[in-house]
């Protein structure tokens, strides 16, 4: 059995905590901590939609992602001249995942913008952003309903995400930065509350991985996602 930092097994998540309502001026917010990765997810509701959605009767959910300068071991420069390709890729992943939570026709022609800001980065920032952002969105929908802006509470599909890697033939759940930087392969799995996959991103780093190794990573992601879904239910 592989033993990792903090006596984690290959199948163990890092310690997780959820703090809700941490931003005074957000419509909803969540601070999610997964080990030493900490991400604050704030939701802003705008009573309009992008031009391509106008007149459709549908709402829109989008996301922005960024890291604070001291989130990493060496100062991360603010992206003042436009977002990098990596940042754009991550925030599109977050947005696609979060749009799976609801039928956009049930939220009216309004935009819910989810800002995911990484306070501390130790691997898995995009997956933590998805899980935390989804929890914050749920609270935002509840607020819209209780304040009368939404006549009916939309049916919400829980959404969670987790990383898995392959190191020396062993699948590892919820990689920290050291593990991620030395993995032979890594993957991000986004799961809906009914157990179906929303998105899977998997890349070989040191060497190609086999079909069986991919299935081992998927099985581990399924286990970790089930634990995150239980966390979601515990927050209800």
From Swiss-Prot:
Entries under PANTHER family matching the protein: EXOSOME COMPLEX COMPONENT, EXOSOME COMPLEX COMPONENT RRP41
Entry keywords, A to Z: Nucleotidyltransferase, RNA-binding, rRNA processing, Transferase, tRNA processing, tRNA-binding
Membrane-crossing residue ranges in chain numbering: none
UniProt xrefs under SUPFAM superfamilies: Ribonuclease PH domain 2-like, Ribosomal protein S5 domain 2-like
Function: Phosphorolytic 3'-5' exoribonuclease that plays an important role in tRNA 3'-end maturation. Removes nucleotide residues following the 3'-CCA terminus of tRNAs; can also add nucleotides to the ends of RNA molecules by using nucleoside diphosphates as substrates, but this may not be physiologically important. Probably plays a role in initiation of 16S rRNA degradation (leading to ribosome degradation) during starvation.
Positions contributing to phosphate binding: 86, 124-126
Species in which this protein is naturally found: Desulfotalea psychrophila (strain LSv54 / DSM 12343)
Top-level taxon of the source organism: Bacteria
Single Gene Ontology MF annotation: 3'-5'-RNA exonuclease activity
Protein name: Ribonuclease PH
Catalytic activities: tRNA(n+1) + phosphate = tRNA(n) + a ribonucleoside 5'-diphosphate
Subunit structure: Homohexameric ring arranged as a trimer of dimers.
Single GO BP term: tRNA processing
EC number: 2.7.7.56
Family according to the record: Belongs to the RNase PH family.
Enzyme class (EC, first level): transferase
